[in-house]
Amino acid sequence: MRAHGWIGLGIVVAAEALLLAREPIVAGWFTPIVWTGYVLFMDGLAARLTGRSYLTTDRVEGVLVALASIGCWWLFELYNAPRFWRGGEAVAGLWWRYHNIEPNLFVRRVGYDWAFATIFPGLFLTATVLRATVFARARVTPWRPSPRALQLAVVVGAVSVAVPVLFVSAWLVPLVWIGWALLLEPLNYRRGRPSWLADLTGGDASRLLALLAGGAVCGVLWEFWNYWAATRWTYSVPYLGSVKIFEMPVLGYLGFPPFTLECYSMYHWLRGWLDADSGLRPPLL
């Protein structure tokens, strides 16, 4: 494994040790620190297994993935606190809330963006490693969605992403985690962009299963590491909200796999707007 992979693993171990020792700076910044270590570790594994990674061969792609991660997660923050501009109690999140956050607004924003920048890279690198190992030979019967099914998915997706903004309700959180995938994946498929739908037409399920499993892995790690951090988030949902594993209500874990499909679709829809002659290599995943 490349040196930066071992450095990343060292960061994860050191961050956990310092957290247990109640070191205040690490405790307050634990999420971005530990996830930076995880991304470095998985990037090193990806380079070892596939010969490619964001920090070795695909650096421009890595920057694009991180920027898309920041922007898309701020979109989800808007869903979570749709009335934030009113101030006061209106800024409280519908589904998750942050605690013990940095009082300085500039430093807080740095912390937010740093943490948000690790989301897509963490998901995609985990999926890359799983695709190269566990799901390398995953095959299914070839399946091609009909034009009508694609159109229906786009319509349902458009409604799903619009309704939680127009009608603010804590009950609508599932729409946020599936709507963008339903809206954008058919568009990526029809325009020839990287797409797990396109893979299925050839019977290749490796990317789809790797993304789903990668979401589950990262979801458990998010909640496990968040539970012990000083600066952390908690959830408020109207269904089985008191039945939890760490801070996440048990039903919430079902959202991580489709969330990963959504992140993948969002990223490749955004990436698809770049000029074909931009010189970018084919994407890592």
Language-model features, listed with the residues they occupy:
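Aromatic-rich, lipid-facing transmembrane alpha helices and their immediate juxtamembrane interface loops
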Residues: 1-285
